[in-house]
Amino acid sequence: MSNGPLSNRPLPSSFDSNDDFYNENGFQKVLRRLKEEPLVPIGCLLTVAAFTNAYRAMRRGDHAKVQKMFRARVAAQAFTVVAMVAGGMYYQADRHKQKELWKLRQQKDAEEKHQKWIRELEARDAEEKALQERLDKRRKRAAERAGGTGTESVAAQARAALRESKAGKTETGEATSTEANQADGGVLGSLGGWFGGSKKAPEDTTPALESKPEDPKN
């Protein structure tokens, strides 16, 4: 039965385990009715037989038999109607119960469909949540990888800048040492020239003036 509150649940019935009663088709239902009310089909057969005999007597021209068969047909029809009314009154309680059970069966089927629909929605919701979690994990891993790559690139740039700074300092130190050595060599050479020997006069680099030609008048 349904999983609702106890107050909404129908009372148990002896038909609950009778699946054949709920799942019978039209032909099975007619057979069940014939078994429950056998006088009704008997009255129908008597009516058909009386009508057939009346037709045959009419073809033969036997008017007395025709009248007799028509009376028999009316009696058979009346018997059928009485059987139907009596059967309806006798099985009224059972039919009412069957109708209620049919309604309960319909409610049960509707509740089962509703519960199945809810379970399907819950399953879809769980699948969507699992998919969303996987997507979030992938995004997180991608972000972590991107962050690690960025940190490594920054560290590599810092190391390269440090190496360039050290190389610049080394070159600057070497250039300073070379200039200092050159300056020391020049000073020592000058001191050696002054204290080690006579100072030479600077050579006159001015070119000698060419003598002018004598005046022919002198």
Curated annotation (Swiss-Prot):
The HIG1 domain covers 11-102
Q: Name one GO biological process term.
A: mitochondrial respirasome assembly
Recorded hits in InterPro entries, A to Z, give: Hypoxia_induced_domain (IPR007667), RCF1 (IPR050355)
Quote the biased-composition stretches of kind Basic and acidic residues, using this chain's numbering: 161-172
The UniProt entry's coiled-coil ranges are 103-137
Query: Which of UniProt's keywords are assigned here?
Result: Coiled coil, Membrane, Mitochondrion, Transmembrane, Transmembrane helix
Keyword Transmembrane assigned:
yes
Show the GO cellular component annotation of the record.
mitochondrial membrane
Asked if Transmembrane helix is a keyword of the record, the answer is yes
Residue ranges annotated as transmembrane are 38-57, 69-91
**Out of the domains of life, which is the source?**
Eukaryota
**Record's Gene3D superfamilies?**
6.10.140.1320
How far does the signal peptide extend, from start to end residue? Answer: none
PROSITE patterns with a match to the protein in the record: HIG1
Extract the ranges annotated as region (Disordered): 132-218
The topology of this chain with respect to the membrane is: Multi-pass membrane protein
Q: Where in the cell is it found?
A: Mitochondrion membrane
| Gly residues: bias regions | 186-196
**Family per UniProt?**
Belongs to the RCF1 family.
- PANTHER family associated with the record: HIG1 DOMAIN FAMILY MEMBER 1A, HYPOXIA-INDUCBILE GENE 1 HIG1 -RELATED
Q: How does it assemble?
A: Associates with the respiratory chain complex III/complex IV supercomplex.
**What's the stated role of this polypeptide?**
Cytochrome c oxidase subunit which plays a role in assembly of respiratory supercomplexes.
What is the name of the protein in this document?
Respiratory supercomplex factor 1, mitochondrial
This protein's species is: Podospora anserina (strain S / ATCC MYA-4624 / DSM 980 / FGSC 10383)
**Lineage, highest ranks first:** Eukaryota, Fungi, Dikarya, Ascomycota, Pezizomycotina
